[in-house]
Amino acid sequence: MNNSITEVNMSVPSRATNSNNTILSEERTCHRSQMASSDAVGRTMALLPINHNHALHHGIKLMPHINMPHREVGATTPLVTNSGTASTCSMSLPGSMSSASDTVCNILPHNTSDSSSIDLASLFECPVCMDYALPPIMQCQSGHIVCASCRSKLSSCPTCRGNLDNIRNLAMEKLASSVLFPCKYSTSGCPETFHYTSKSEHEAACEYRPYDCPCPGASCKWLGELEQVMPHLVHHHKSITTLQGEDIVFLATDISLPGAVDWVMMQSCFGHSFMLVLEKQERVPDQIFFALVQLIGTRKQADQFVYRLELNGHRRRLTWEACPRSIHDGVQSAIAVSDCLVFDSNTAHSFAENGNLGINVTISQVSPSIS
């Protein structure tokens, strides 16, 4: 088979006929805290630090190519896990295409109204996954196209069973530059459309994309809608503690544990749930701690709040204040740019009492919450 790229100008095809060391799985790294609320003043709850390896249908129109106050205390209890071992804790807690001319034809809508515009994007639908085949667009000898992702897994054309040669469909590539494609999450509510060159960038940060399990370092591969995040945590990560109120104490125990460790707690206030994370990483020549707050919500909702972390004791005070991050962004994105409270092990021990580190957490609402 000749592997060289053959450039073939194809006429615009007819419309296609085809239109989810540590505790593994869910119990793994989220044995860090208990998903139970506590209203008792001064009540102590156990949180578990975890050792780990550290982890359309959419109408499309042709573009200009055409001629047209009280602190509740939550205490953490470490779960020591060696690499490779699992430990537990007694916590209750497109159809056929013609191969004709070298010219891309202008496709005109039947009329100028939006409702009657031609769904050009559907011409690019992959017959396998129904996503869009975007430039460079490859075709079989009969002119059928398939997206790059599916093509790498196929040995023959899914439409005609012919050979999948390295033939580019230049006509479709030219047409693609004149089409606005809907976001892949349009069925989830995203109304945006994009030129194919900016489609992937948007989708990587789209507010309508599925949410990952927010537990840091967890092996949990769960994906779901925002409304399903808290039920998922309640039923599958039952060891995460939830404290009520806008002003609490997050107590991390045994901060001297070796290796990478996470402490996690939930805080409920203002009708929202926030995830408090303290992560320790092994970095030469010292251990580094990262503390931050995430909102179980969208980025727009997160902008309505400010959180304050404070280490206080031994005539010292260390404070960090910022807007919480949405769980869509994740813990690691904040750590990567140090958008969190960062301190070394010497600082941690200077504020610790008997190996336990208390962090005062205050959440404030800066403007009315957006649902």
UniProtKB/Swiss-Prot annotation:
Gene Ontology CC: cytoplasm
Binding annotation for Zn(2+) 2: 213, 220, 232, 237
Keyword annotations from UniProtKB, A to Z: Metal-binding, Transferase, Ubl conjugation pathway, Zinc, Zinc-finger
Residue ranges of the region described as SBD: 175-366
Pfam families per record: Sina_RING (PF21362), Sina_TRAF (PF03145), Sina_ZnF (PF21361)
Top EC class, one word: transferase
Family matches, as CDD domains: Sina
Residues where Zn(2+) 1 binds: 183, 190, 202, 206
Functional pathway: Protein modification; protein ubiquitination
Subunit-structure text: Homodimer.
Known function: E3 ubiquitin-protein ligase that mediates ubiquitination and subsequent proteasomal degradation of target proteins. E3 ubiquitin ligases accept ubiquitin from an E2 ubiquitin-conjugating enzyme in the form of a thioester and then directly transfers the ubiquitin to targeted substrates. Mediates the ubiquitin-mediated degradation of nuclear receptors for retinoids SmRXR1 and SmRXR2.
UniProt remark on domains: The RING-type zinc finger domain is essential for ubiquitin ligase activity. The SBD domain (substrate-binding domain) mediates the homodimerization and the interaction with substrate proteins. It is related to the TRAF family.
Name assigned to this protein: E3 ubiquitin-protein ligase sina
Gene, per the UniProt record: SINA
